[in-house]
Design a protein with these regions (language model features):
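Conserved alpha/beta cores of soluble small-molecule-handling proteins
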Residues: 1-138
């Protein structure tokens, strides 16, 4: 495992050890899955590609002076994501499931949370993507 250079972190994507996924199938959200794969397989007629059906948020996890990890405005991010889902006709992920996913991915990737002295944070990008195949034209 390569040591991270906290003073020279890039601004942009950096692979972490894990991500978590929850799939919506048969009118319900499934179980939380831990994954290390960086790609998302999807159908060429996925609604995110044809209709832009996608929602995201951005959160930060900080390490406090006491060493404890804190996540900034977790509930507010869940509410905003739910609001976006309502606007684009996507199933909403409950606040409880959102928190479960964020807490799990932060714990799994804790080694990527910079030390307090750095003033930096781990950026988390929750993403909901419509991957179901659907292309329609109105007549």
């Amino acid at each position: 495992m390569k040591e991270l250079d906290w003073a020279n972190l890039p601004f942009g994507y950096m692979k972490t050890d894990y991500n978590v996924r929850i799939y919506y199938r048969n009118e319900q959200w499934g179980e939380l899955e831990v994954c290390s794969e960086e790609t998302i397989p999807m159908h060429m007629a996925a609604t995110c590609l044809h209709y832009g059906q996608e929602a995201f948020e951005g959160l930060k996890a900080f390490r406090g002076k006491d060493g404890k990890v804190r996540i900034f405005r977790l509930e507010e991010n869940a509410a905003r994501l739910q609001s976006t889902c309502r606007g684009i006709l996507m199933p909403e992920l409950s606040t409880e499931r959102f928190k479960e996913a964020i807490l799990k991915v932060v714990k799994l990737n804790e080694r990527f949370i910079p030390p307090y002295e750095s003033g930096a944070s781990l950026y988390i990008r929750p993403l909901l993507v419509g991957t179901g195949a659907q292309v329609r034209s109105e007549e």
